């Protein structure tokens, strides 16, 4: 996937990898972080080295460097600090996480396969691999899929939803469903 910000160069392509005190992750991001510049400066002050000009790398470094006893606490800290729109898929050494911004600007869904779970930004991706739609990741929710199964690890309450008006018109494929509504 091409970067959400920064130039469309190979080094900005996703997934973005980051390694820090919390382990190593690979992250895919749909959206834009509007407070990226001050967060980047702060992370550089912590000793984080940036290889891209992408806001996705800022999110990845936050997750691998913010304090917290577990992924739920780290995601909570990250979500309190980020401003903007984001749907994230994060791969750790033993789990996959799906994280959606508090306003639900970008879609994110969970699918079920016979052998496990899938996280995707659109339901049409589920169709291509034979997965069935399970549910949307709610605005402000972070889910994790690990050896314990699928569960919510953080839920930030927010009044209302602010889905992007261009999602259904320009971005989404016509064979997708977003927020439980068919696009076509």
Model-derived regions, located:
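Conserved short alpha-helical segments that host acidic/polar catalytic motifs at enzyme active sites
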Residues: 1-139, 144-184
């Amino acid at each position: 996937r091409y970067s959400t910000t920064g130039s469309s160069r190979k080094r900005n392509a996703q997934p973005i990898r980051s390694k820090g005190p919390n382990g190593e992750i690979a992250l895919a991001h749909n959206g834009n972080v509007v407070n990226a510049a001050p967060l980047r400066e702060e992370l550089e002050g912590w000793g984080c080295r940036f290889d891209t000009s992408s806001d996705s790398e800022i999110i990845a470094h936050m997750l691998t460097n913010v304090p917290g006893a577990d992924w739920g606490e780290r995601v909570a800290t990250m979500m309190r600090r980020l401003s903007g729109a984001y749907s994230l898929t994060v791969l750790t050494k033993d789990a996959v996480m799906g994280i959606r911004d508090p306003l639900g600007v970008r879609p994110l869904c969970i699918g079920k396969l016979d052998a496990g779970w899938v996280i995707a930004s659109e339901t049409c991706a589920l169709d291509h691999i034979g997965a069935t739609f399970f549910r949307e990741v709610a605005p402000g929710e972070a889910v994790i899929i690990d050896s314990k199964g699928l569960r919510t690890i953080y839920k930030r309450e927010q009044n209302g939803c602010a889905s992007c008006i261009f999602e259904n018109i320009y971005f989404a494929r016509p064979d997708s469903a977003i927020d439980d509504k068919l696009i076509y």
